[in-house]
Amino acid sequence: FGGTGWSLGWKVCLWARLGDGENALRLIENQLRPINPKALIRVRGGGSYPNLLDAHPPFQIDGNFGVTAGIAEMLIGGALPKCWSGKVTGLVTPDDTISYAFKNGKRVK
């Protein structure tokens, strides 16, 4: 579940498309892990700088874009992790506009 930049975004999208929100979430958490930009050594890949840019020196914007695309894929395809509750309103796909509420990873509306 490691990786940096575009590879994390790509993996989030793949797990979301496979309907596995739990594994997609693990990668999102890796992407959002705070990184000290001045640290000389990092044990694991991934993470975000304090400005939320992807930590792949200097940075890879496609990592940020890929992870957000993966989150949209999770919401569109219903690959919701059990710990997620909330609602999505007006998420546009080529064929539809999606709005629903969800609790503990399950749609309620």
Tell me what each language-model feature is:
Residues E22-K109:
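Non-catalytic C-terminal accessory modules of carbohydrate-active enzymes
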